[in-house]
Design a protein with these regions (language model features):
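Membrane-embedded alpha-helical bundles of multi-pass transporters/translocases
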Residues: 1-493
């Protein structure tokens, strides 16, 4: 029987489907806090409430992932177990995200609305995210095909994320703001992205063929015990989960809000600058995603991690030295940005290795326990991504309070509201914001810089040490596991 997972169509249609998903994820996860910060006047209590909502919703979301994975695992339909949830999830997510960025509520009314919306997003995004990534192990067990599929999918995900990271700041902040105010601009951007996301995912829904031999097996019951036993019964899952969590916390610090706020405070309230910071910072990751399959054939994963760790050390050192030693200006900006690019290259390489290492535990689980439980295991990737983002929100909010960031953002949000109501012209708004930014103390900007460099480095190094010491599923061991599984299947026929 022909293995449909090697079908070339899958290698294009599956990755293409995630472009819009990652645009919508980038908009909500990376910019919702910035949107709230620069469009709403927040008291300390309200900032605390926003933080509590975001942390609570993301922790809930993370805990919901294995449950959703189990629900998908037992889904049986003529369309398979993954695609129905792709459709339901992406359509409901688009509606929720559009509403999130198109409200004029202020004060505690907005806080209540924000709480409802954020928890709805947590539920709806999980539906299609778990089902999408759960398909990977159903498309191929061949390590080279899986490497190609994973790296290409991350490339397309990166394309969606980079497009959003570049355009959103340019269109919502500074002189290029759509509609003359940040609030109006975010509403329009959300509309476009929420239309594009379902359209892109149609490529996966209608163009991908996955293995469906599970349809002949008994439907497993929904059981928290099963979820717990799957996770705790496989020591490699436990170790890679801890490593992945630490790496993701460090990786998300810059994109979680600290990066944009630092750029605005240190170099001016201009979205184009943060877009440049993102564009250059993420540029090298595109090359890594393209060439990762070739690198994987030449180097073992742990060898690659040595080189990636060194790159990040150099990158973070450049960021710290340039940020502390150089005076303001574009020379400082470009050196800082290049440093971020080098550091991010190492971080993203770690992410790719963590992704593949987690997926490879599916076969190891089958080897140990006789069950693949692919939807449950692959649900751990978004589980720890969301748990990491919850921790990053708490870290970001604490940093803002420590360095008095909201004292400045409240002044900016008042001007943004006045501009959206037509009370002041855009030119006057920008001039007054420039005055506010120029009053920021150097110590406040330096504090933000140290938070977005030292913390990611420390966490990355911790994940590096733990992976090297405790993860045993290297290339040889994985091949041994797959050979044993194939032998068992042959003997069972």
């Amino acid at each position: 029987m022909k293995n449909v997972t090697s079908d070339k169509r899958n290698l294009w249609m599956f990755p293409l489907g995630t472009v819009g998903r990652d645009m919508i994820y980038n908009l909500f996860t990376n910019f919702i806090f910035t949107y709230v910060l620069f469009t709403r006047h927040l008291t300390a209590a309200q900032l605390g409430a926003v933080t509590a909502i975001m942390v609570g919703a993301r922790v809930f979301d993370a805990l919901n992932d294995p449950v959703m994975g189990n629900i998908i695992e037992r889904t049986r339909s003529r369309y398979g177990k993954f695609k129905p949830w792709l459709v339901i999830g992406i359509l409901s997510t688009s509606v929720v995200v559009y509403l999130a960025f198109n409200t004029s509520l202020q004060g505690w009314s907005f806080i209540a609305f924000f709480g409802v919306i954020y928890f709805l997003y947590s539920i709806t995004y999980t539906m299609h995210d778990i089902s999408y990534w759960g398909m990977v192990s159903a498309l191929s067990s061949d390590p080279h095909v899986r490497d190609s599929l994973t790296s290409r999918t991350n490339l397309f995900a990166g394309i969606g994320g980079v497009i959003a990271s570049i355009l959103i700041p340019m269109l919502t902040t500074g002189s290029g703001t759509l509609g003359g105010s940040t609030a109006t601009a975010y509403g329009r951007v959300a509309l476009v992205i929420c239309i594009l996301a379902p359209l892109f995912l149609c490529a996966t829904i209608f163009g991908v063929r996955e293995r469906r031999d599970y349809n002949t097996k008994e439907v497993p019951p929904v059981s928290f015990k099963k979820i717990w036993n799957t996770i705790t019964g496989n020591p490699q899952i436990l170790w890679i989960s801890l490593v992945f969590l630490l790496q993701q916390i460090g990786n998300d610090v810059v994109m979680g809000g600290l990066g944009s706020t630092y750029v605005y405070f240190a170099f001016g309230y201009e979205g184009g600058l943060y877009s440049l910071f993102n564009t250059v910072g993420l540029a090298a990751t595109a090359l890594l995603m393209i060439f990762y399959p070739m690198l994987a054939k030449r180097f073992r994963r742990k060898q690659m991690m040595d080189k990636l760790m060194l790159l990040s050390v150099i990158g973070y050192a450049v960021m710290i030295v340039s940020g502390l030693a150089l005076s303001g200006g574009m020379v400082k900006f470009w050196i800082l940005t290049v440093g971020y690019m080098v550091a991010n290259l190492g971080q993203y390489g770690f992410y790719l290795i963590m992704m593949i290492s987690l997926i490879n535990t599916v076969e190891y689980n089958e080897y140990l326990r006789g069950e693949r439980d692919e939807a449950i295991i692959t649900s751990l990737r978004p589980f720890f991504t969301k748990l990491a983002s919850a921790i990053v929100v708490a870290v970001t909010s604490a940093t803002y309070l420590i360095f008095g960031v909201t004292g400045y953002t409240n002044q900016i949000s008042a001007l943004e509201r006045a501009a959206s109501l037509g009370e002041i012209a855009e030119a006057e708004k920008l001039a007054q914001i420039d005055t506010i930014v120029s009053s920021i103390q150097p110590g406040q900007s330096r504090g933000l810089l140290l938070c977005l460099t030292v913390l990611p480095f420390v966490l990355m190094y911790a994940s590096y040490v733990l992976y090297k010491k405790h993860y045993i599923l290297d290339e040889d061991k994985y091949a041994e596991v797959c050979a044993e599984l194939e032998k068992r299947r042959t003997e069972a026929k």
